[in-house]
From Swiss-Prot:
Subcellular location(s) of the protein: Membrane
Species of the source: Dictyostelium discoideum (Social amoeba)
Keyword Acetylation: no
Gene: tagB
Primary localisation category: membrane
CDD domains the record matches: ABC_6TM_TAP_ABCB8_10_like, Peptidases_S8_Kp43_protease
A GO biological-process term: sorocarp development
Biased composition (Basic and acidic residues): 1407-1420
Composition bias, Pro residues: 1872-1886
Residue numbers binding ATP: G1553, P1554, S1555, G1556, S1557, G1558, K1559, S1560
UniProt name for this protein: Serine protease/ABC transporter B family protein tagB
GO cellular component, one term: plasma membrane
PANTHER family: ATP-BINDING CASSETTE SUB-FAMILY B MEMBER 10, MITOCHONDRIAL, ATP-DEPENDENT PERMEASE MDL1, MITOCHONDRIAL
Lineage of the organism: Eukaryota, Amoebozoa, Evosea, Eumycetozoa, Dictyostelia
Length: 1906
């Protein structure tokens, strides 16, 4: 029966859940509204922190220091956009008035704040008013929030109209009062998430932060309602709408008209874009133009405006005004709330034999292009390039084994791992992409070719290529650059080069475009990726390509190459026709306007001016210039064409320069697939060409970066050898920092023009070490890329990488990170060099170069400045922390005598100094402003011409100094430790709305309701789930040890079969509660909710106490009191619901469990009830079962509530003070030890208590049941004394249990009280020391109480579990011993293969299942020794012939001499023992006594066969064949010996013999009350079918057994008579009573048949016997077994019943046991038994004539009649003994069988209970004497028996021969005994043939066997 809720209950629970969810939601909103208050104290802390780091000793006076501080940490409230600078101190914030009086007050207060910043009192008043107004605004918002949730669907139309404008999302600029840090950013995010309501279908996207905008502002996409609520926050200073004019960045002029325009969105859908396009096209109808909108991704849209008669790809038309159309379109789009930035797409354009010698050279000399000077060439690295195409047939890229892998990855290709065909799969003639790839990594497959001298730089690296153009067109990359970079990244590339870009056509030179933002975004998401971009070839300042302005990319400019290149390769492979200029000759004379280069060259001798258009002349002039002016053409000069910086916001670009002039590399031959290299000889004009440009410099820098990455990844740094532990995975920022740090400013001349001078490059240094022309200088890798194998002398440069100092492993390196206000320092030492050689030594000027690089988040393209996170690099003297210099200072930007200006623009900062004396230096990186953090960074520095090393320590402070420190949402303090390092920042106070979290030492919202629910409920459920998983795992392990499956008998409770002595395990207990797991889960959930609600109450109580000193009115606590009340109500509600459900579960469980136990008892066979007392069994049913139920359900709920309360309280106490919490955990081991000791005593005493209770109950029941005997013998006083003794045992045991629990509880109480005192004392000390608040102390104390209570509950669970095991022991003994049926034949086979002994449990697997199975499949008869066949009568492994289906087998070591009270008797004899030994033995017995349960069951349970023969009708024929039997309680006494009898259908048979001869046992065997044991037990057949194969209930439906003692129920007489059949009629009952001659005395009773047995007084024995006979007659069974039914009847009744029996024999088989001859005189046959032997059989007359035992029993003169020799009697079945002779089973042959011993006789022929120990010993001695006598007699009889056997065999042979001759069966069934079986065979029962017919057929006439 499953647990079900009624309809009111469902409504009640559903309403409660809704109430809780609403409360949680409102609480979440309220907590979100309670934000940190950034007050003046917080700002003061920042200033003090800053002033400390910038020490007084830095500058001469305070004025300089203040100027510097103000410059760095300026809090100027201006929003810097490209189109506009917004001064938020002047421009008002958004209007949050909305006709609300309270909001008007808020605006007035805000104005007051702006106008009265110097008046502190007014500010405080205004802040208070603001807080009140914020409260009312919040209430108004949440009221509308709830009303919207409850609004019906019918109001959707009105709702949409009312709220469309209010909830339409738009872009707002939100400025913070203070610097943005991680916490304030997360606050804003949480606010947007918590207040976001998506109502409009066209705007399904969420509110979110779009971009950072300087200063201290975010561009936010949200609703107007959110902006109004956000403006009331204390931490917000200004909010304004993002005006449409600030979104547009377009110039409308002829050059740019018609080019695509990109619209950056904050969210979009296809339907939204379609709606835009339809609207715009309807507007443009009058302008004869259209617009095409294409969605690139969800945040980028491409727009093209075109005329109606042209396609979208056209640029202009005279038939329409595109300028006017574009202005209309983009003005309209800018007014749409989803757009945030609009910019024009720009026109894309593309922008080596000696180049490697330049890059890997030094400032003084070049190196050779070989493996000695350049040993590393990028092996194991993959670089990627996106360009116009790649000629795969060129020898630099072709592979003789593998083709080019197009759109797939194949790392087996020697050069190209993938070729992504975005446009096509080839390059055009003289293609740009082929040349670029050749410079980067191209090399022929045969390195011996001469052309290999022009190989690229990273010849061992492989290429991942992305094709950007089709044919000879300019490159066209995807609009979303991540679609280009991501496939290359996935192919394994980590360094990428782009030699192309776009040129702005609208005047924003060096502007930060959306393409640049896309590059920054990809690098920010994939920090290990590096992108190098060409600066451009526009030669002017601020002429960088748009993509080159990306902050995180490495922008590459072009320097000149080695001078030898100009006089050799350039003249050979450069096409000078590209330089032909026809404009100037045309201006001179119009006739030259149409000249060709050939015409120019033909007339150049006459007109020198034509040299300008003659390539040959141009080449000659160049050659002359190269030769005569080498100072203008060498590697120390910049390329004049290289684009220069800065960017639009003043950032320094390019970053580095590389050779880019006259670079000779691979030439493409277009579609021709022929290898243009030919035989690889030189010169090779088909395979090589020379080009100039930054496009040529970029692949060389890309290759150099790839080699640098190989250097780090392979572990060459810093030893110059590949070392495994030195392998480092670099980030892109680290590679960039290393490239820049080791770059070198070119110091050559710069070629302006022929008329100008050649100034030094030094005048262009805007900062120290860098300028706008060459950035940080040219790559010179040899200065530090040291490889020991090629150069054993270490370089003169010492290099340090931040985070890789002393004792730091390269394999564990990762970037450090900073948030706002934090810093990181690196210290090193410098000493002047004592020699000119050695590591770190040199003869030049000492020099220190440091570089800081970080990957900055992408910027908003419309911002005026594009740096988001600002870090600053400072160099300090570590001895006194005085600042020496700051990053990016010096140069022309810092005039002499002025204070160094901090860099707020670049994400690259450098410092270059020349140390003059030995000193400890400290580089400090400060997180000046990190709005999107934490910001990771890479720091690299090197020293040259001196001795450098990491410092042993890096001091950060002065010893003993304390200083306030910045913490999130609060204020802390830190001290300078003895190691001169700042200690951890300790929280001093938290801002409003935050609480101290001692676990993280921070101020968090960690203690909010939402987190508590998650931690407490979630954690508890996880623990419970883990517990259940552990139980199921244990159950799984148990199932692997046996082959049993758990079974259900209809009660819903499952029990796994085990041995009787097996321990009760948690899986066993879980099986009892599993049917109620749903109800218990609901009750547990209710308990969790109630416990969670109770846990929160101390927190709010503590808040009230904390706020009392600063509170003026009790009304301010209203919200806290309401919350406490709601929590208390929730606790009350769910506690009662949980108790109600658990109570119902308790009652249901005890009902089912008792039903289960009762079923197990009812299913037991008779042997079980002979061994166990019924009163004891009832005690288990009534006492143990409810105790087990209570413990089980109580344990589960206690675990749930205890864990819930413990986890939740621990969360609070740890967040309040983890130190105080340790005091509790110090007490846990003591509590656990006490509990463990208590549980051990409790387990033992509980078992004793249950046992003594059972004994007392048993004694009381027996005394009351046998009251006649007690009264008759006057033993009342004796029984009272015995019962008192039993109760005294109960009392003594209970007293011990009480004492144990009392002492344990007292110990726990003392420990808890001591713990509470210590905690209270220490917390009071902390309060006095101002380290703790009173409210926290009260909350902590309350939570400690919760923790202690929960701990005690959980420890009590363990004690309850131990008690549960004690009560479960006897219950499971009964449940496991219940007979049960196997469910499938497969299980029987599994049991057989597992080697189950006699069908019982236990494993007998020898691990050879495979062999066993093979034996079976091969049909072998011999099975392994451990395999027990399930067929009946097979000898068990214990040597005894036990029935596998019998619960009473003598299996294993079960001691059947145990007393019923469970006390094991010691087998050793007590004869000859001293008193001391007797005492010890008694103590030993006493110990064994308490180990017992009082219940005796078989070692293994009974397994019934999986299938039975079902009888639908019965003839009533019964046959005994070789039946022998022993009672399970007396296995040493054989009751029946080899009995052979046959009862034919429809006849009456009598069984007579002395008491104890086995008559009643025979009837019980027919009823299958006891199963036969093994092969020696013989067989009993009913209608030719072995009764072992018949289901017991099916068999008994045809058999009725009237016992010699009538058993009547406490019911009416009629109910007792009709008990055997269902729904008996009154006529059936009366008829049966008449036949039993009971009708007359029943009618004499007052109520006749309705008389209760108890109300009828004491019925006589005869009356009870007649009622029992009537019940048997009423059953109308085919076979009637009557046991002494006439024993207590008067002669008249006896005669009547005898006549009735004659009537019953008509159609029935009747077997009667009687001691009176009158009862059996008329039987068809009488069987005479004596001492378990069948001694005679025949009719009354025949037996009297034989004058045997029957005659002596019933004749008047017994002594005069001699006893016939039974061995010569043909009816004695013992003459034909089919079993082996046994001295104990064969009576003497020459004398009558001696009568049975009196002490073994039991009245009514029942097996006696075990005698007392002394009687048993006497009996054993007598039996031993008898056995000795029998052995002597046996020796005398052996010869005679052998002779008799020989005679019998001869007679049998003669009879068989005679039978064969006559072909007729014998006349008498019993005349011819069956032949003895072979030694290896067993007697086989009659079985059926394949057709289901009996093999033994009965002749209907003669009723004889064929």
């Amino acid at each position: 029966m499953k647990f079900q809720f009624s309809s009111p209950s469902k409504i009640f629970l559903f309403s409660s859940v809704i109430l809780i969810l609403i409360f949680i939601g409102i609480k979440f909103e309220l907590l979100e509204d309670t934000n940190s208050n950034r007050n003046d104290k917080f700002n003061n802390i920042i200033n003090r922190f800053i002033n400390y780091n910038i020490d007084d000793s830095i500058y001469k006076n305070k004025q300089q220091q203040q100027q510097f501080s103000n410059k760095i940490y300026s809090n100027e409230k201006k929003i810097l956009l490209k189109n506009k600078i917004i001064d938020t101190t002047i421009k008002p914030s958004i209007n949050i008035n909305n006709n609300n009086n309270n909001n008007n007050k808020l605006n007035n207060n805000n104005n007051n704040n702006n106008n009265n910043n110097n008046n502190n009192n007014n500010n405080n008043n205004n802040n208070n008013n603001n807080n009140n107004n914020n409260y009312y605004n919040s209430i108004e918002y949440y009221s509308s929030f709830v009303s919207r949730l409850l609004k019906s669907n019918d109001d959707d139309g009105i709702y949409y109209d009312d709220y469309q404008s209010k909830y339409k999302k738009n872009h707002y600029i939100v400025q913070f009062k203070d610097r943005i840090n991680d916490e304030t950013r997360e606050q804003l995010k949480e606010f947007l998430i918590g207040t976001d309501i998506t109502i409009l279908k066209e705007q399904p996207f969420k509110s979110h932060i779009v971009h950072y905008i300087p200063h201290d502002s975010f561009l936010v996409f949200m609703t107007k309602e959110q902006s109004v609520l956000l403006s009331s926050k204390e931490w917000i200073s200004w909010i304004g709408e993002h005006e449409p004019s600030n979104k547009i960045h377009l110039n409308y002029h002829e050059k740019s008209i018609g080019y695509p325009v990109y619209i950056i969105l904050s969210g979009s859908t296809n339907s939204l874009i379609q709606r835009w396009e339809n609207t715009l096209n309807s507007i443009l109808t009058s302008y004869n133009s259209k617009v095409k909108l294409t969605l690139i991704n969800q945040k980028k849209l491409k727009s093209i405006v075109y005329c109606n008669d042209e396609s979208p790809s056209s640029s202009s038309s005279s038939s329409c005004s595109l300028i006017g159309s574009e202005k209309i379109v983009y003005k309209w789009i800018s007014e749409q709330s989803e757009s945030n930035y609009i910019e024009r797409s720009e026109k894309l354009q593309t922008a080596n034999r000696l180049s490697p010698t330049v890059i890997f050279g030094t400032k003084d000399k070049l190196v050779n292009n070989d493996r000695i000077d350049i040993p590393l060439r990028g092996k194991g690295q993959i670089l990627s390039i996106a360009d116009t195409g790649l000629d795969g047939s060129h020898c630099f890229f072709s592979d003789s084994k593998y083709p080019i892998p197009f759109n797939q990855v194949n790392e087996n290709h020697r050069k190209v791992v993938t070729y992504i065909t975005y446009h096509d799969n080839e390059d055009y003639v003289n293609g740009h992409g082929t040349h670029v790839c050749g410079s980067a990594a191209g090399t022929p497959e045969d390195s011996s070719w001469a052309i290999s001298s022009f190989s690229g730089l990273a010849t061992d690296a492989k290429i991942a290529f992305y094709d950007l153009s089709s044919g000879s067109s300019e490159p066209t990359p995807p609009e979303d650059y991540s679609q280009m970079y991501k496939p290359l990244y996935d192919a394994g590339a980590r360094v990428h080069g782009d030699s192309w870009g776009s040129v702005s056509l609208q005047g924003y030179y060096g502007g930060y475009s959306d393409d640049a933002g896309g590059i920054d975004a990809f690098l920010y998401e994939y920090p290990e990726f590096s992108i190098l971009r060409a600066a451009g070839n526009n030669e002017l300042f601020a002429s960088l390509l748009a993509q080159a302005t990306a902050k995180n990319a490495i922008t590459v400019g072009a320097e000149q190459t080695a001078h030898v290149n100009y006089v050799s390769d350039a003249l050979e492979y450069y096409d000078f026709s590209d330089n032909a200029n026809f404009q100037r000759p045309c201006l001179f004379d119009k006739k030259y306007c149409n000249y060709t280069t050939a015409k120019c060259c033909s007339e150049v001798s006459n007109v020198k001016g034509l040299q300008l258009c003659c390539p040959a002349s141009i080449k000659q002039n160049a050659s002359d210039s190269f030769t005569t002016q080498p100072q203008f053409y060498n590697e120390n000069n910049m390329g004049s064409f290289s684009s220069k910086g800065p960017t639009h916001d003043g950032r320094l670009k390019p970053d580095i320069v590389a050779p880019g002039e006259y670079i000779t590399s691979a030439r493409s031959n277009g579609e021709n697939s022929t290898d243009q290299c030919g035989d690889g000889s030189l010169p090779n004009a088909n395979g090589l060409m020379s080009i100039s440009g930054t496009s040529m410099a970029t692949p060389l820098a890309t290759a150099a970066t790839t080699i640098l990455r190989q250097y780090l990844v392979d572990g060459y740094f810093p030893t110059g050898e590949s070392v495994e532990e030195n392998k480092l995975l670099p980030t892109g920022s680290l590679l960039k920092a290393l490239m820049i740090n080791n770059a070198q400013l070119l110091n050559g001349t710069y070629f302006w023009s022929a008329s100008s001078t050649n100034p030094s490059n030094a005048i262009f240094e805007q900062i120290n070490g860098a300028n706008l022309i060459q950035g940080w200088g040219a790559l010179r890798m040899n200065n530090w890329l040291y490889v020991k194998s090629s150069n054993p002398t270490p370089p003169s440069r010492w290099i340090g990488i931040g985070g890789l100092g002393k004792n730091q492993k390269a394999t564990e390196w990762k970037e450090d990170s900073l948030s706002s206000g934090l810093n990181k320092s690196y210290c090193f030492t410098y000493k002047p060099s004592s020699s000119s050689s050695g590591s770190g030594g040199g003869g030049g000027t000492p020099r220190i170069v440091a570089t800081l690089v970080w990957t900055d988040p992408p910027s908003y393209s419309g911002a005026k400045f594009n740096l988001v996170n600002n870090l600053d690099l400072l160099l300090l003297n570590s001895d006194d922390d005085s600042i020496i210099t700051i990053g990016n200072s010096g140069g022309s930007l810092q005039p002499a005598g002025k204070v160094a200006q901090p860099d707020t623009l670049n994400n690259v900062e450098g410092i270059i100094i020349n140390p003059t004396k030995a000193m400890n230096y400290k580089f400090t990186i400060a997180g000046t402003n990190v709005p999107i953090g934490p910001q990771k960074f890479s720091f690299v520095f090197h020293g040259e011409n001196g001795q450098f090393d990491w410092a042993d320590s890096c001091p950060q402070c002065v010893d003993g100094v304390q200083f306030p420190c910045l913490i999130t949402n609060g204020i802390g303090i830190q001290s300078c430790g003895s190691d001169l390092l700042w200690t951890k920042c300790i929280v001093q106070s938290c801002n409003e709305g935050y609480n101290y979290n001692s676990l993280k030492n921070t101020c968090d919202k960690f203690l909010s309701y939402n987190y508590i629910i998650i931690i407490v409920a979630g954690g508890t459920m996880v623990l419970i789930i883990l517990l259940l998983m552990w139980i199921k795992y244990q159950e799984y392990k148990e199932s692997k040890r046996d082959s049993f499956r758990r079974f259900d008998d209809g009660t819903g409770i499952f029990v796994r079969p085990k041995d009787k002595d097996a321990k009760v395990t948690p899986p066993d207990l879980y099986n009892l509660v599993s049917p109620f797991i749903i109800e218990l889960t609901i009750a547990t959930a209710c308990s969790l909710v109630a416990t969670a609600a109770s846990i929160l109450q101390p927190f709010y109580i503590g808040n009230i106490v904390n706020n009392i000193p600063t509170t003026k009115s009790i009304g301010e606590f209203k919200s806290d009191f309401i919350i406490i009340f709601i929590l208390a109500f929730i606790e009350f509600l769910f506690t009662n619901v949980g108790s109600w459900i658990s109570g119902i579960v308790n009652e249901k469980m005890v009902m089912r469990l008792q039903n289960k136990v009762f079923r197990a008892l009812i299913a037991q066979d008779m042997g079980f009830f002979q061994r166990n007392n019924s009163a004891l069994l009832m005690n288990v049913l009534i006492v143990d079962t409810p105790m087990l139920r209570s413990a089980l359900t109580g344990i589960l709920l206690s675990i749930a509530t205890g864990v819930c309360k413990l986890v939740g309280s621990l969360v609070f106490i740890f967040t309040i003070s983890w130190k105080l919490s340790l005091a509790f955990f110090a007490a846990v081991p003591i509590l656990g030890l006490v509990t463990q000791i208590q549980s051990q005593f409790t387990k033992r005493l509980t078992r004793q208590l249950l046992f003594h209770n059972s004994k007392a109950s048993q004694h009381g029941t027996e005394s009351l049941t046998n009251m006649h005997v007690v009264t008759n013998y006057c033993k009342q006083e004796k029984e009272m004394v015995k019962y008192s003794d039993q109760l005294m045992n109960v009392f003594i045991t209970a007293r011990k249990l009480i004492i144990t629990n009392t002492f344990a509880g007292t110990g726990k109480w003392l420990l808890i009280e001591s713990l509470t005192f210590v905690i209270l004392y220490f917390s009071a000390y902390l309060v006095i020391q101002k380290q703790f608040t009173v409210g926290l102390m009260i909350s902590f104390s309350l939570y400690i109480g919760y923790v202690v209570d929960a701990s005690s509950s959980l420890f009590g669970v363990y004690v309850s579990y131990i008690q549960c095991l004690a009560s479960a022991t006897r219950v499971f003994m009964i449940l496991r011993s219940a007979p049960r049926k196997r469910t499938t034949l497969e299980e029987e086979e599994a049991d057989r293969l597992a080697g189950l002994s006699g069908g019982g449990g236990g494993g007998g697997d020898n691990g050879d299942d495979k062999k066993d199975k093979q034996n079976i499949e091969n049909g072998k008869d011999v099975l392994p020794s451990n395999i027990i066949t399930p067929i009946d009568n097979v000898e068990n492994s214990n040597g005894k012939q036990d029935d596998p289906n019998n619960n009473n087998n003598n299996i294993g070591n079960l001691d059947y001499s145990e007393q019923l009270d469970g006390v094991s008797t010691v087998a050793d004899s007590t004869v000859g023992l001293t008193k001391r030994e007797l005492k010890k033995q008694k103590e030993k017995e006493q110990k064994e006594y308490f180990k017992q349960t009082g219940i005796s069951v078989a070692e293994t349970p009974t397994f019934l066969p999986s299938s039975y023969t079902e009888l639908t009708e019965c003839r009533g024929e019964i046959e005994f064949k070789n039946v022998s039997f022993r009672y399970p309680t007396r296995p040493d006494v054989q009751v029946l010996h080899n009995i052979n009898m046959k009862f034919e259908a429809g006849k009456c048979y009598g069984l007579v013999g002395p008491s104890g001869s086995g008559k009643s046992t025979t009837l019980e065997l027919i009823s299958k009350f006891y199963p036969l044991h093994g092969e020696t037990g013989g067989k009993i057949y009913m209608d030719g079918i072995d009764i072992a194969k018949i289901r017991p209930n099916n068999l008994r439906s045809f058999v009725t057994n009237v016992h010699q003692h009538p058993f009547l129920f406490d019911a009416t007489i009629g109910e007792n008579i009709g008990y055997a059949i269902d729904n008996p009629t009154q006529e059936d009952i009366i008829e049966a009573a008449k036949l039993a001659y009971a009708h007359e005395f029943i009618n004499d009773l007052p109520k006749k048949y309705d008389t209760q047995i108890g109300e009828a007084g004491n019925l006589s024995g005869g009356q009870k016997k007649r009622i029992a006979v009537a019940r048997a007659i009423c059953a109308k069974r085919k076979i009637m077994l009557l046991d002494e039914i006439t024993a207590e009847l008067d002669p008249e009744s006896e005669e009547a019943i005898t006549q009735s029996i004659k009537v019953l024999t008509q159609g029935h088989t009747v077997v009667m046991v009687a001691h009176k001859v009158a009862a059996v005189r008329d039987c068809d046959k009488i069987f005479v038994l004596e001492k378990g032997y069948l001694v005679e059989e025949g009719t009354h007359d025949e037996l009297m004539a034989n004058k045997g035992k029957y005659y002596r029993m019933f004749s008047e003169d017994k002594d005069d009649t001699p006893l016939q020799n039974n061995n010569n009697n043909k009816n004695n079945n013992n003459n034909n003994n089919n079993n082996e002779p046994s001295s104990s089973s064969t009576p003497p042959n020459d004398q009558p069988t001696p009568p049975p011993q009196e002490q073994q006789e039991q009245k009514n022929d029942q097996p006696p209970p075990p005698p007392p120990q002394e009687q048993q010993e006497q009996q054993e001695q007598q039996q031993q004497q008898q056995q000795e006598q029998q052995q002597q007699q046996q020796q005398q009889q052996q010869q005679q028996q052998q002779q008799q056997q020989q005679q019998q065999q001869q007679q049998q042979q003669q009879q068989q021969q005679q039978q064969q001759q006559n072909d007729q069966p014998p006349n008498d069934y019993d005349q011819v005994p069956p032949p003895p079986p072979l030694p290896s065979e067993s007697p086989s029962p009659p079985t059926g043939n394949n057709d289901g017919q009996p093999l033994v057929q009965m002749d209907e006439e003669n009723d004889e066997e064929r």
